């Protein structure tokens, strides 16, 4: 199969793997555009904590067009249903330009939903269900969620609010047949996964966390608390926003925040890899490249053997 026979190139990998830098180099080589598959980078004013690293989108002075970054206000509801719709809108526009779009990100559910063309319901909030579940622990809620068989984002269940939303979605499927449904075809995509040694990944995560704190990540969260969002809303976004918020409202010391956040990011990267390995078991062919190969595009394509 030749490269032009694909409808899409997908670049995936865990956090701190360098997948965005690789995708932008690829886009520059192919005169392409990037569609982000990151569930948090859609939000404006959440730049440092989500690792947008927009400098990556400039290669040798050339701007690489990107999409689905900074499209929502912080606090606005965004989910896989909306992502599917937004992706296909951008995907179609890029294809009409005669370009091969590149999907890049680490949110496995978002990636899988568009590649397989999952039919998804637009699920409303269930206030009664939320009230019944709000006092349960994370472990109790995870047990409830695991009792369902439908697809849900197990890489992103690190807060009570997120798990309740996942349960809300699962309970809606058998009963809300008349809700709007996204119905899209599956997409023939070349999938490239960036594989990074576990110890190197851990070192990168630790160094990156230190760098982001030095760049003003705490100030970013503080500004969001002062101007836009409540603590509960920020905690919902998890990881950096969760732990820094807990620090700012006095529930954690700086040292506790730093240690717990670092551990949580390592755990998140591990869950991402678990999701990607699950994709392989579900029939996706992922061509894994080593992080050290990323500058050698021709060698990568020759090895993949289209």
UniProtKB/Swiss-Prot annotation:
<dbReference type="InterPro" id="IPR018022">
    <property type="entry name" value="IPT"/>
</dbReference>
<keyword id="KW-0547">Nucleotide-binding</keyword>
<dbReference type="GO" id="GO:0006400">
    <property type="term" value="P:tRNA modification"/>
</dbReference>
<keyword id="KW-0067">ATP-binding</keyword>
<protein>
    <recommendedName>
        <fullName>tRNA dimethylallyltransferase 1</fullName>
        <ecNumber>2.5.1.75</ecNumber>
    </recommendedName>
</protein>
<feature type="binding site">
    <location>
        <begin position="13"/>
        <end position="20"/>
    </location>
    <ligand>
        <name>ATP</name>
    </ligand>
</feature>
<feature type="region of interest" description="Interaction with substrate tRNA">
    <location>
        <begin position="38"/>
        <end position="41"/>
    </location>
</feature>
<keyword id="KW-0808">Transferase</keyword>
<comment type="similarity">
    <text>Belongs to the IPP transferase family.</text>
</comment>
<dbReference type="InterPro" id="IPR039657">
    <property type="entry name" value="Dimethylallyltransferase"/>
</dbReference>
<feature type="binding site">
    <location>
        <begin position="15"/>
        <end position="20"/>
    </location>
    <ligand>
        <name>substrate</name>
    </ligand>
</feature>
<comment type="subunit">
    <text>Monomer.</text>
</comment>
<feature type="site" description="Interaction with substrate tRNA">
    <location>
        <position position="107"/>
    </location>
</feature>
<dbReference type="Pfam" id="PF01715">
    <property type="entry name" value="IPPT"/>
</dbReference>
<keyword id="KW-0819">tRNA processing</keyword>
<comment type="function">
    <text>Catalyzes the transfer of a dimethylallyl group onto the adenine at position 37 in tRNAs that read codons beginning with uridine, leading to the formation of N6-(dimethylallyl)adenosine (i(6)A).</text>
</comment>
<dbReference type="GO" id="GO:0052381">
    <property type="term" value="F:tRNA dimethylallyltransferase activity"/>
</dbReference>
<keyword id="KW-0460">Magnesium</keyword>
<dbReference type="GO" id="GO:0005524">
    <property type="term" value="F:ATP binding"/>
</dbReference>
<dbReference type="InterPro" id="IPR027417">
    <property type="entry name" value="P-loop_NTPase"/>
</dbReference>
């Amino acid at each position: 199969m030749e490269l032009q026979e694909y409808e899409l190139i997908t670049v995936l990998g865990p956090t701190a793997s360098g997948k965005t830098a690789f995708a932008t180099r690829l886009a520059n080589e192919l005169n392409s555009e990037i569609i982000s598959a990151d569930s948090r980078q859609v939000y404006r004013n959440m730049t440092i904590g989500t690792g947008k690293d927009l400098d990556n989108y400039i290669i040798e002075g050339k701007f690489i067009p990107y999409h689905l970054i900074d499209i929502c206000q912080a606090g606005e509801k965004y989910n896989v249903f909306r992502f599917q719709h937004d992706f296909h809108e951008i995907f179609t526009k890029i294809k009409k330009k005669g370009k091969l779009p590149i999907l890049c990100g680490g949110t496995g559910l978002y990636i899988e939903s568009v590649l397989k063309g999952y039919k998804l319901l637009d699920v409303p909030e269930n206030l009664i269900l939320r009230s019944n579940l709000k006092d349960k622990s994370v472990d109790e809620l995870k047990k409830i969620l695991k009792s369902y068989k439908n697809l849900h984002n197990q890489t992103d269940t690190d807060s009570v609010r997120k798990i309740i939303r996942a349960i809300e979605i699962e309970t809606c499927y058998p009963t809300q047949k008349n809700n709007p449904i996204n119905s899209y075809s599956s997409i023939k995509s070349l999938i490239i996964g960036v594989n990074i040694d576990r110890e190197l990944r851990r070192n990168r995560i630790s160094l990156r966390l230190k760098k982001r704190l030095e760049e003003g990540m705490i100030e970013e969260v503080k500004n969001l608390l002062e101007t836009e969002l409540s603590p509960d809303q920020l905690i919902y976004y998890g990881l950096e926003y969760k732990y820094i918020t807990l620090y700012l409202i006095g529930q954690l010391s700086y040292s506790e925040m730093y240690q717990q956040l670092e551990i949580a990011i390592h755990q998140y990267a591990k869950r991402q890899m678990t999701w990607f390995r699950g994709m392989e078991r579900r029939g996706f062919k992922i061509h894994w490249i080593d992080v050290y190969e990323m500058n050698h595009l021709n060698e990568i394509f020759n090895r993949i053997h289209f």
